């Protein structure tokens, strides 16, 4: 540690360098951009010509083939860009490129629910560098995005508050830089697992923070430390609303990372992206899925994921629950505080949306050892069976369990109860549920009753009391 401090001090003592670019301004390698404990290596960003940032416009009229636009107003006027629509600008991260399928797939989901100008930013000329260099190139790309936003306002009358920047990884900090350069006038910035190395713990002027837009929300999916866990995302809160799905570190469906001993951040990405970065990539997959599942990513205000998992943060508060992803800006209390933390669980496959329920079961019948399961039936569909309790089943006992259904069942109409013995029981005992209450995350409770008991592996249907 002493050597690192000495190294940083010596770097900071060296006279800083500066580069200037037309319309974008000047960029220095002085602190806090370089020569600090968090950013020990001094570097200047590459030129706009070398980075070659491109803006790829998709609209409802051209969903499959982009139109290339620039910050020149004439190119925008000659495109399908509509000033009466919201503009969402998607910015990729390290090693990535603007023509990856995930960006256009996100646009296509938007077209299913809204009329929108969807611009994918391609800055692969600057992202496919060493990581330390790419973190400096972020500044130039952010300046170019800010220039585009300013031209939309000055030349086309399209206000910044109708612009939404969505950045993944380093792209989150590109969005933050653009927000700073437009003095927080941009309507919304969404950070999708904002990159940790060279940003965590740095001053706000270096990274994404809540002052960069009128509303900033963030999704954290790879928040374990970079060393030794190889977590690429920030654990630090950066927005008005910060969501930590599945606790924010290990996402369902992602294998444990066997490359966790690699510590050279300039070499960890190439060739390992799809495997090593599974948690990191989940953030944009969740966002894409949230667009077509407007109620499937409810976040619960909680002090920690452990407390959330202990069923102590249900149901939603008086203002409801914010939705992680596309509809986070619909939450009434979105900007009442900074760094509000929310937790939720997701699925492990392509359909990531989940709906949380609390089930309370009061048992009847005989005393046995076994486990009980419940399935929900509503006007929106039927859930699969979920285990509520396993152990000694006593008549009159009440068991409570929260679970995350892959189906929004809507208004509950009935429930089905089933139980199984843990051991062979020749007496063929009968067990039932005299009452089952189901609470949704909005606080509405549905009550169901039955006087019947059943043998194991026999369904018991309970109707509304």
From Swiss-Prot:
Inhibited by bile salts, is reactivated by (pro)colipase/CLPS. Residues 355-465 form the PLAT domain. GO terms for biological process: cholesterol homeostasis; fatty acid biosynthetic process; high-density lipoprotein particle remodeling; intestinal cholesterol absorption; lipid metabolic process; post-embryonic development; response to lipid; response to peptide hormone. GO terms for cellular component: extracellular space. Ca(2+) binds at residues 204, 207, 209, 212. The active site is at 169 (nucleophile), 193 (charge relay system), 280 (charge relay system). Residues 1-16 form the signal peptide. Keywords: Calcium, Disulfide bond, Hydrolase, Lipid degradation, Lipid metabolism, Metal-binding, Secreted, Signal. Disulfide bonds join 20-26, 107-118, 254-278, 302-313, 316-321, 449-465. Its EC number is 3.1.1.3. InterPro entries: AB_hydrolase_fold, Lipase, Lipase_LIPH, Lipase_N, Lipase_panc, PLAT/LH2_dom, PLAT/LH2_dom_sf, TAG_lipase. One of its GO terms (molecular function) is triacylglycerol lipase activity. It catalyses: a triacylglycerol + H2O = a diacylglycerol + a fatty acid + H(+); 1,2,3-tri-(9Z-octadecenoyl)-glycerol + H2O = di-(9Z)-octadecenoylglycerol + (9Z)-octadecenoate + H(+); 1,2,3-tributanoylglycerol + H2O = dibutanoylglycerol + butanoate + H(+); all-trans-retinyl hexadecanoate + H2O = all-trans-retinol + hexadecanoate + H(+). CDD domains: Pancreat_lipase_like, PLAT_PL. It is found in: Secreted. Expressed by the pancreas. Pancreatic secretory (zymogen) granule. Forms a 1:1 stoichiometric complex with (pro)colipase/CLPS. Plays an important role in fat metabolism. It preferentially splits the esters of long-chain fatty acids at positions 1 and 3, producing mainly 2-monoacylglycerol and free fatty acids, and shows considerably higher activity against insoluble emulsified substrates than against soluble ones. Belongs to the AB hydrolase superfamily. Lipase family. This is Pancreatic triacylglycerol lipase. It comes from Rattus norvegicus (Rat). The lineage of its organism: Eukaryota, Metazoa, Chordata, Craniata, Vertebrata.
């Amino acid at each position: 540690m002493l050597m690192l401090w000495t190294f940083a001090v010596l770097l900071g003592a060296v006279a800083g360098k500066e580069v200037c670019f037309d319309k974008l301004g000047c960029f220095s390698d002085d602190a806090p951009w370089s020569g600090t404990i968090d950013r020990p290596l001094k570097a200047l960003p590459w030129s706009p010509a070398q980075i070659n940032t491109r803006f790829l416009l998709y609209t409802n009229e051209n969903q499959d083939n982009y139109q290339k636009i620039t910050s020149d107003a004439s190119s925008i006027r000659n495109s399908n860009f509509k000033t009466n629509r919201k503009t969402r600008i998607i910015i990729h991260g390290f090693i990535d490129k603007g023509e990856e399928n995930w960006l256009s797939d996100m646009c296509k989901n938007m077209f299913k629910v809204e009329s929108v100008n969807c611009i994918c930013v391609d800055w692969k000329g600057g992202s496919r560098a060493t990581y330390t260099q790419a973190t400096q190139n972020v500044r130039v790309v952010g300046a170019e995005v800010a220039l585009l936003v300013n031209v939309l306002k000055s030349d086309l009358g399209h206000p910044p508050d109708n612009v939404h920047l969505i950045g993944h990884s380093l792209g989150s900090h590109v969005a933050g830089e653009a927000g700073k350069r437009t003095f927080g006038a941009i309507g919304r910035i969404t950070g999708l697992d904002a990159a940790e190395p060279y940003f965590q713990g740095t001053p706000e002027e270096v990274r994404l923070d809540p002052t960069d837009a009128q509303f900033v929300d963030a999704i954290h999916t790879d928040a374990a430390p970079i060393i030794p866990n190889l977590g690429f995302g920030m654990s630090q809160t950066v927005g008005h609303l910060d969501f930590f799905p599945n606790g924010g570190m290990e996402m369902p469906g992602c294998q444990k990372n066997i490359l966790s001993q690699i510590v050279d951040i300039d070499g960890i990405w190439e060739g390992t992206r799809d495997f090593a970065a599974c948690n990191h990539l989940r953030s944009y997959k969740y966002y894409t899925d949230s667009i077509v599942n407007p109620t499937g990513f409810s976040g619960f205000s909680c002090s920690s994921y452990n407390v959330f998992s202990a069923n102590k943060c249900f149901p939603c508060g008086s203002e409801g629950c914010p939705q992680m992803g596309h509809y986070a800006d619909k939450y009434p209390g979105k900007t009442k505080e900074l760094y509000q933390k929310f937790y939720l669980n997701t699925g492990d496959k392509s359909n990531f949306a989940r709906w949380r329920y609390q089930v309370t079961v009061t048992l009847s019948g005989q005393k046995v050892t076994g486990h009980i399961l419940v399935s929900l039936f509503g006007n929106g569909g039927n859930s699969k069976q979920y285990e509520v309790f396993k152990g000694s089943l006593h008549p009159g006992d009440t068991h409570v369990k929260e679970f995350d259904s892959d189906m929004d069942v809507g208004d509950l109409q009935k429930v089905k109860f089933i139980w199984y013995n843990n051991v062979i029981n020749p007496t063929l005992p009968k067990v039932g549920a005299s009452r089952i209450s189901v609470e949704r995350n909005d606080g509405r409770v549905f009550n169901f009753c039955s006087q019947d008991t059943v043998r194991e592996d026999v369904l018991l249907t309970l109707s509304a009391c």
